[in-house]
C-alpha cells in the first residue's frame, strides 16, 4: 500500500471503487468518475470513448494522498498504474550513495508507472506527492486486459510513453549540454513559464519544489540554486514572494540561456 494512502471515513465522505460521489481530506474535491471529470477532454488518457471510460471506472480505486506520500518506489515490483487526477507528483531516481535526480514533475492527466506495469519490470523511478493529490489506482491484473480490450486506450498509452521519452531527452539535453548552473536554472524557469505568460509580459508561477528539489532537477547543489535565485533577483529578472516566483524579464532569462 502506498505511503500516505488513506481511505476516508463515512463522516468525511468515502473514497470507494466505481466512481461514487466522494469528498476527501487534504482540501481536495475528489473527481467522482472519468465520465463526470471536468478536465476529461483536455487529458490524453482520460478522453476515451464512453465504453472504455465506463470500464475504466469499474476497475479503478480512487484515493487522496497528502504532500510527501509515496505512490511507488524505484526497484519495487509493479503493482499497477496511478491516474493522476489532481495535484503534482515528482518522479526521481537515486544512486547507491544517496544522491537523487528528479527527472520530471507529473501533473493531472498523466498515468504514472506505465513502463513498469506494461513490461512487468520493476518501477524505474520513485513517485512522491508534491501537493495534496488524487491518484486513481488500477492493478496490473486489471490494466493489461483493459488495454487488450480497448485499442484506443492502448494507443493513448503509447502516446504518453512517447511524450515521456521526448521529455526525458529534453531533460538530458538540459543537464548534459548546458554550460553552467545559471543556464540550467534559467532554462528550468523558462520551461515552467511557457504556458503562463500574462498580458504585461510578467509570468507568475507557484513553485511546489524546494531549492533542494530544483537542484536535483538541474544537477546542481542546493546552495548553488539559492545563490542563483538571489543573483537573478538582484538583476531584476524575477521576484520571489514565498512560493510564488514572478518572472519580470523573460528576455533576460533567455539571454542567460543563449549566452
Where do the protein language model's features map onto the residues?
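Polybasic "coupling" helices that flank or enter modular domains
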Residues: 148-217
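Phosphate-/nucleic-acid-contacting segments
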Residues: 3, 12-15, 20, 188, ...
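Cyclic-nucleotide recognition modules
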Residues: 53, 104-166
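Short loop/turn motifs at secondary-structure junctions and domain boundaries
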Residues: 54-55, 71-75, 199
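Cyclic nucleotide-binding regulatory module and flanking cytosolic helices
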Residues: 11, 18-67, 111, 116-118
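Cyclic nucleotide-binding regulatory domains
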Residues: 44, 69-132
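Aromatic (phenylalanine/tyrosine) cluster motif
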Residues: 5-7
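A residue-level structural signature of the nucleotidyltransferase/glycosyltransferase Rossmann-like core
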Residues: 81, 103, 135-136, 206, ...
Amino acid at each position: 500500500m502506498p505511503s500516505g494512502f488513506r481511505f476516508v471515513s463515512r463522516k468525511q465522505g468515502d473514497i470507494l471503487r466505481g466512481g461514487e460521489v466522494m469528498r476527501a481530506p487534504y482540501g481536495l474535491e475528489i473527481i467522482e468518475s472519468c465520465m463526470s471529470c471536468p478536465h476529461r477532454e483536455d487529458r490524453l488518457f482520460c478522453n476515451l470513448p464512453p465504453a472504455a471510460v465506463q470500464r475504466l471506472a469499474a476497475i479503478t480505486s480512487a484515493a487522496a494522498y497528502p504532500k510527501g506520500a509515496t505512490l511507488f518506489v524505484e526497484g519495487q515490483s509493479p503493482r499497477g498504474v496511478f491516474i493522476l487526477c489532481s495535484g503534482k507528483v515528482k518522479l526521481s531516481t537515486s544512486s547507491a550513495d544517496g544522491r537523487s535526480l528528479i527527472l520530471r514533475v507529473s501533473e493531472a492527466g498523466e498515468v504514472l508507472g506505465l513502463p513498469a506495469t506494461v513490461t512487468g519490470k520493476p518501477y524505474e523511478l520513485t513517485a512522491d506527492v508534491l501537493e495534496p493529490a488524487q491518484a486513481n489506482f488500477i492493478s496490473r491484473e486489471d490494466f493489461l486486459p483493459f488495454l487488450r480490450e480497448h485499442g484506443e486506450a492502448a494507443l493513448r498509452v503509447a502516446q504518453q510513453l512517447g511524450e515521456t521519452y521526448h521529455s526525458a531527452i529534453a531533460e538530458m539535453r538540459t543537464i548534459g549540454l548546458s554550460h553552467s548552473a545559471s543556464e540550467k536554472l534559467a532554462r528550468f524557469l523558462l520551461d515552467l513559464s511557457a504556458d503562463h505568460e500574462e498580458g504585461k509580459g510578467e509570468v507568475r508561477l507557484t513553485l511546489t519544489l524546494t531549492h533542494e528539489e530544483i537542484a536535483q532537477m538541474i544537477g546542481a547543489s542546493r546552495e548553488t540554486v539559492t545563490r542563483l535565485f538571489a543573483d537573478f533577483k538582484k538583476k531584476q529578472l524575477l521576484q520571489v514572494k514565498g512560493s510564488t516566483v514572478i518572472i519580470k524579464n523573460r528576455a533576460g532569462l533567455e539571454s542567460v540561456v543563449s549566452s
